Amino acid sequence: MPDQKTVLAASVYERMKERIMDQYYPPGERLNIDALAIDLAVSPTPIREALARLAAERLITFEAYKGYRVSPLLTLEQVHDLMHARRLIEVDGARLAAKHIMLPDLITVEKIMQRILDESAHTEVGSWSHGYRQFNQLDKDFHELILTAADNLFLLGAYRSLNVHIELGRFYQVFQEMDQQQTCVEHDAIFRALKAHNGDAAAAAVEAHLHATEERIFRLIDKYPHAVTAVAKGTR
């Protein structure tokens, strides 16, 4: 059983992460350890531990003599580069997964899809703490399970290093809009190809899903350009 200090550190980390994702601490905002400790009614120690974890997830950055600051949103070019990297990893990963995936993994994938569908029915759009966190985690589980089934640790490690669901999830928090139902449709196409052990179809379904995801992000950026500008400047 975790000790009290470990539980407290984990709780502080989750609270700070939630505030970053919900734009309470907007991109570019400085994070002062003493001020955070007062705000969250804890000592500086769990704050430092939480900051270290958040920095590892690239949600915040640290500069010598300047301290911590909430990381900026990805630029348009970086979003494109991130999605390109995903395609390089996940498309071939899906092709391999279709070859290797076993019934227990297929059952797990199907259960995740059902939970995503259930979450999408009552998620409060735009709120990390009221539903989207669960949806985001389930979507992450879906993609990671496929790469796990690909039976290539290097592909899985490369995917995890991208920190995809945190980076892209922050955009949905800004725009307070997402199309979960369409995501479910795209996931179903991937699942059916995996279940049929059709590598080419699985690769094509993942390619289509990632392309659609990128288009959704850029549509939101085009629709809410002022929101991106405001957040980038760290305004509330």
For each predicted feature, which ranges?
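Short linear motifs at protein or domain termini
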Residues: 1-99, 222-236
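Structured catalytic/translocation cores of nucleotide/phosphate-coupled proteins
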Residues: 7, 30-33, 168, 195, ...
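Short helix-capping and inter-helix turn/linker motifs at the boundaries of alpha-helical repeat units
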Residues: 7, 61, 133, 180-181
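Juxtamembrane helix-loop transition sites at the ends of transmembrane segments
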Residues: 45, 82, 169-172, 216-219
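Conserved amphipathic alpha-helical segments that form helical-bundle/coiled-coil interaction surfaces
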Residues: 101-172, 184-193, 201-211, 215
